[in-house]
Amino acid sequence: MAVFKTTLWRLISGTLGIICLSLMATLGILLKNSFTKLSVEPAYTPGPNIELQKDSDCCSCHEKWVGYRCNCYFISSEEKTWNESRHFCASQKSSLLQLQNRDELDFMSSSQHFYWIGLSYSEEHTAWLWENGSALSQYLFPSFETFKPKNCIAYNSKGNALDESCETKNRYICKQQLI
């Protein structure tokens, strides 16, 4: 009788131990995946930038900003005119996105949306200029000659540029250079 109780107790405790280890392993995997998902998926909703989060290899970005190659990007989900977008970015100590190269938006998912960037037509200079006053490099937008003067440029992650009236409401991307 005592041998039977000992064997039964060992069987029950062994089974419960295996179940406990399985649950702990599952919990560990779920926690790892949820933290990885949180740090990879950017929040595209605008809001105050209070908390800092590590999003980039070499720098920290504010909450709701995406870190990529030592720059921080705010990708809006609301639509504004080009000037409203520019003012919002300036209020966040950033500017509308000035593309340095066509690969700059590789981190974005394949979004169908067009976003205002910091490129508009300057009547004074009769040229397309970035918000900081520098000229547009033709290799970025080979078809820029077909853009209509007096417009602003919206861009999507597939590398397409669209010239629209600056009063049209679009989503927008702010860029903050940290280095």
UniProtKB/Swiss-Prot annotation:
Gene expressing this chain: KLRD1
UniProt cross-references to CDD domains, sorted A to Z: CLECT_NK_receptors_like
Subunit structure: Can form disulfide-bonded heterodimer with NKG2 family members KLRC1 and KLRC2. KLRD1-KLRC1 heterodimer interacts with peptide-bound MHC-E-B2M heterotrimeric complex. KLRD1 plays a prominent role in directly interacting with MHC-E. KLRD1-KLRC1 interacts with much higher affinity with peptide-bound MHC-E-B2M than KLRD1-KLRC2. Interacts with the adapter protein TYROBP/DAP12; this interaction is required for cell surface expression and cell activation.
Species of provenance: Macaca mulatta (Rhesus macaque)
GO biological process terms on file: negative regulation of natural killer cell mediated cytotoxicity; negative regulation of T cell mediated cytotoxicity; positive regulation of natural killer cell mediated cytotoxicity; stimulatory C-type lectin receptor signaling pathway
Chain ranges passing through the membrane: 11-31
InterPro entries for the chain: C-type_lectin-like, C-type_lectin-like/link_sf, CTDL_fold, NKG2/CD94_NK_receptors, NKR-like_CTLD
Pfam families, sorted: Lectin_C
Carbohydrate-modified residues: N83, N132
Cytoplasmic topological domain: 1-10
Limits of the C-type lectin domain: 68-175
Any Gene Ontology CC annotation: external side of plasma membrane
Function: Immune receptor involved in self-nonself discrimination. In complex with KLRC1 or KLRC2 on cytotoxic and regulatory lymphocyte subsets, recognizes non-classical major histocompatibility (MHC) class Ib molecule MHC-E loaded with self-peptides derived from the signal sequence of classical MHC class Ia and non-classical MHC class Ib molecules. Enables cytotoxic cells to monitor the expression of MHC class I molecules in healthy cells and to tolerate self. Primarily functions as a ligand binding subunit as it lacks the capacity to signal.
Extracellular side: 32-179
SMART domains the record matches: CLECT
Coiled coil residues, start to end: none
Tissue: Natural killer cells.
Subcellular locations according to the entry: Cell membrane
Keyword terms, alphabetized: Cell membrane, Disulfide bond, Glycoprotein, Lectin, Membrane, Receptor, Signal-anchor, Transmembrane, Transmembrane helix
Name of this protein: Natural killer cells antigen CD94
Disulfide cysteine pairs (residue numbers): C58-C70, C61-C72, C89-C174, C152-C166
